[in-house]
Amino acid sequence: MSDSNPGAANPALGPDADAAAGEGLELAQFAAGCFWSVELTYQRLPGVARTEVGYSQGHRHEPTYRDVCGGGTGHAEVVRVHYDPKACPYEVLLDVFWAKHNPTTLNRQGNDVGTQYRSGIYYYTAEQEKAARDSLAEKQKEWKERIVTEILPATRFYPAEEYHQRYLEKGGQSAKKSCNDPIRCYG
């Protein structure tokens, strides 16, 4: 195994090499607790063309929800966002990320506990990395507690089971752009 390519022996550790879902679109990955409400928040954002929920940053190839919830895969529940940077700059995605969750609770959001619920920004480019680190430094000034958000290169993305995709929208909550209805998470 080459040190420069950890994904050579384990595909889960390699970079997310998927292409965005359209010309002019870019990808971003965020972990902010249960992916259902995070996904709906990004679905409503003008400039976001597509969202997907799934698993990233772990070591098991092709994990399932059950595997991830078992805690042994190292994966986080993430939302992968396909966005138009001209209509929705990456910094706007970061603002939504910080507003959506408590970045000071380690491996927990509300009643959801486990490493899969950790806070993370997973970048695709050096520009995204810089913006993420700069935004974390600014947000830390607003919190008394230490922010525990990890900022790492985006590793391979594994889509969650179809059941989880657009879960809250399929349950009747609006995904219309700019919708401000409260998001209710339920399972």
UniProtKB/Swiss-Prot annotation:
One GO biological process term: cellular response to oxidative stress
Assigned GO CC terms: cytoplasm; cytosol
Pfam families cross-referenced by the UniProt entry: PMSR
Localisation per UniProt entry: Cytoplasm, Cytosol
Domain of life: Eukaryota
UniProt keyword Oxidoreductase, yes or no: yes
GO molecular function, one term: L-methionine-(S)-S-oxide reductase activity
Keywords recorded for this protein, A-Z: Cytoplasm, Oxidoreductase
Reactions accelerated catalytically: L-methionyl-[protein] + [thioredoxin]-disulfide + H2O = L-methionyl-(S)-S-oxide-[protein] + [thioredoxin]-dithiol; [thioredoxin]-disulfide + L-methionine + H2O = L-methionine (S)-S-oxide + [thioredoxin]-dithiol
Leading EC class: oxidoreductase
Enzyme Commission code(s) on record: 1.8.4.11
Major subcellular site: cytoplasm
InterPro entries assigned: Met_Sox_Rdtase_MsrA_dom (IPR002569), Met_Sox_Rdtase_MsrA_sf (IPR036509), MsrA_MetSO_reductase (IPR050162)
Function recorded in the entry: Catalyzes the reduction of methionine sulfoxide (MetSO) to methionine in proteins. Plays a protective role against oxidative stress by restoring activity to proteins that have been inactivated by methionine oxidation. MSRA family specifically reduces the MetSO S-enantiomer.
Family, similarity comment: Belongs to the MsrA Met sulfoxide reductase family.
PANTHER family noted in UniProt: MITOCHONDRIAL PEPTIDE METHIONINE SULFOXIDE REDUCTASE, PEPTIDE METHIONINE SULFOXIDE REDUCTASE A2-2
UniProt-recorded name of the protein: Peptide methionine sulfoxide reductase A2-1
Record lineage: Eukaryota, Viridiplantae, Streptophyta, Embryophyta, Tracheophyta
Gene expressing this chain: MSRA2-1
